[in-house]
C-alpha cells in the first residue's frame, strides 16, 4: 500500500513545480505582414447587389398547388369535426372504462338483478307482437318496472326528471301547434262572421 502511495505522490508533486521557459528570437525573421479582420475571406460581407428571383413553377408543383387549394375546405371541415368529436369520444371511452371497472367489481347481487331486468325486457318484446308502437313501449316499460323494484329511489328520481322533460316537450309541442293553427286557420280571409254579427 505504501508503495502505491509513493508512486502516485511522486508525479503529482512534480506538477506543483513552476518553470520559466524563454523562447529564443529568430535571427532572420521576415517582415510582418499583418492582415486586417475585414480582409479575411471568412468575415467578408457580400455586395448588396444580389436579387431574389423566384424560379418558375413546374407543372407538378402547379398541379399540387391546385390540388391543395381544392382539398383545403374538406381538410378544414375534417379538422373541425375531429376537434368537436374528440372530447365526446374521450368521454365515451372513459364511460366505457368506468363501466368495465364497475362490472369487474360489481356489488353482490348485481348480476341476478340485471338478469331479471333483461328478462323483463324480453317478456315485453314477446308481448309487443304486431304494432311497432308496442315494440317501442313495452320492452322499456317492463324493464323500467323491474328496475324500479330493485332500485326504488333511483326510479323516483328518474320518474321526476323524465316527467319534467315530458311536460316541457308537451308544452313546446302545444306552442308549435298553436302557432301553426294561428298561421293557417286564422288568417283574415279565413275568418267567418259569427252568427251574432251582420
UniProtKB/Swiss-Prot annotation:
It comes from Homo sapiens (Human). The chain crosses the membrane at residues 108-128. InterPro entries: MIC26/MIC27 (IPR019166), MIC26/MIC27_animal (IPR033182). It comes from the Eukaryota. Component of the MICOS complex, a large protein complex of the mitochondrial inner membrane that plays crucial roles in the maintenance of crista junctions, inner membrane architecture, and formation of contact sites to the outer membrane. Plays a crucial role in crista junction formation and mitochondrial function. Can promote cardiac lipotoxicity by enhancing mitochondrial respiration and fatty acid metabolism in cardiac myoblasts. Promotes cholesterol efflux from macrophage cells. Detected in HDL, LDL and VLDL. This is MICOS complex subunit MIC26. It is a single-pass membrane protein. Disulfide bonds: none annotated. GO terms for biological process: cristae formation; inner mitochondrial membrane organization; lipid transport. Expressed in all tissues examined. Up-regulated in diabetic heart. GO terms for cellular component: cytosol; endoplasmic reticulum membrane; extracellular region; extracellular space; Golgi membrane; high-density lipoprotein particle; low-density lipoprotein particle; MIB complex. Keywords: Endoplasmic reticulum, Glycoprotein, Golgi apparatus, HDL, LDL, Lipid transport, Membrane, Mitochondrion, Mitochondrion inner membrane, Proteoglycan, Secreted, Signal, Transmembrane, Transmembrane helix, Transport, VLDL. It is found in: Mitochondrion inner membrane; Secreted; Mitochondrion; Golgi apparatus membrane. O-glycosylation; glycosaminoglycan of chondroitin-sulfate type. Glycans are attached at residue 162. Belongs to the apolipoprotein O/MICOS complex subunit Mic27 family. Component of the mitochondrial contact site and cristae organizing system (MICOS) complex, composed of at least MICOS10/MIC10, CHCHD3/MIC19, CHCHD6/MIC25, APOOL/MIC27, IMMT/MIC60, APOO/MIC23/MIC26 and MICOS13/MIC13. This complex was also known under the names MINOS or MitOS complex. he MICOS complex associates with mitochondrial outer membrane proteins SAMM50, MTX1 and MTX2 (together described as components of the mitochondrial outer membrane sorting assembly machinery (SAM) complex) and DNAJC11, mitochondrial inner membrane protein TMEM11 and with HSPA9. Residues 1-25 form the signal peptide.
Amino acid at each position: 500500500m505504501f508503495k502505491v502511495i509513493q508512486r502516485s505522490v511522486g508525479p503529482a508533486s512534480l506538477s506543483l513545480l513552476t518553470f520559466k521557459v524563454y523562447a529564443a528570437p529568430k535571427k532572420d525573421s521576415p517582415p510582418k505582414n499583418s492582415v486586417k479582420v475585414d480582409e479575411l475571406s471568412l468575415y467578408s460581407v457580400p455586395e448588396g447587389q444580389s436579387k431574389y428571383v423566384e424560379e418558375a413553377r413546374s407543372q407538378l408543383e402547379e398541379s399540387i398547388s391546385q390540388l391543395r387549394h381544392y382539398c383545403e375546405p374538406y381538410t378544414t371541415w375534417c379538422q373541425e369535426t375531429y376537434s368537436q368529436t374528440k372530447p365526446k369520444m374521450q368521454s365515451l371511452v372513459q364511460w366505457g372504462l368506468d363501466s368495465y371497472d364497475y362490472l369487474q367489481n360489481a356489488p353482490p347481487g348485481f348480476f341476478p338483478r340485471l338478469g331479471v331486468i333483461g328478462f323483463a325486457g324480453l317478456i315485453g318484446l314477446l308481448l309487443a307482437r304486431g304494432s311497432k308502437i308496442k315494440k317501442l313501449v313495452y320492452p322499456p316499460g317492463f324493464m323500467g318496472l323491474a328496475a324500479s323494484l330493485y332500485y326504488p329511489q333511483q326510479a323516483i328520481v328518474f320518474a321526476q326528471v323524465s316527467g319534467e322533460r315530458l311536460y316541457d316537450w308537451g308544452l313546446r309541442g302545444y306552442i308549435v301547434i298553436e302557432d301553426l293553427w294561428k298561421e293557417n286557420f286564422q288568417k283574415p280571409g279565413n275568418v267567418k262572421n259569427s252568427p251574432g254579427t251582420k
